[in-house]
């Protein structure tokens, strides 16, 4: 389901109760992103459960060579680093990294604590290790120096800000870059109804209920419009 389809569903619900109100698509998207994150945390934070691929997003990252991980001592070898910072990932799911060019080696995503201990075993020479550092970039290392020829990767994860990640999505196979509204919104079908409900509820705000200031038991309340 695309951003546009979800926006339409929200606005269609709101027409039932508020014909004279105006809601911008940008604000609806902001709330969709906000409550998507809330619903995914609520559903998956405390249980070990398979998360559907529809909750994940893939972003494209260009890589550059650097002498060390920011904040870590220089070890004399080279690293690859994403050219741009990576959007914040949620603490659910299993991030995955894939090469996007000729390199056929395996890329293994690991914690940043493990990063300092890997990449020294010649028997695992074809494995590239990858981790997100505190500075927000992805770093890559390997025993095999050929990994330095890797130029671009796809990073697949569940991101906190779906809009930010969507703006870094890979182009279509024909090179087309879709507008945000035409892209798939990353949420499983089962969570669409509660997502729409939460967004509509916030946009409606508190329901207006006129008060009987005189408390005289007469049917003389003003019309609520």
From Swiss-Prot:
GO terms for cellular component: virion component. It comes from the Viruses. It is found in: Virion. Coiled coil: none annotated. The keyword Protein biosynthesis does not apply. Homododecamer. Forms the tail multi-ring barrel with ring protein 1, ring protein 3 and ring protein 4. This is Ring protein 2. The lineage of its organism: Viruses, Duplodnaviria, Heunggongvirae, Uroviricota, Caudoviricetes.
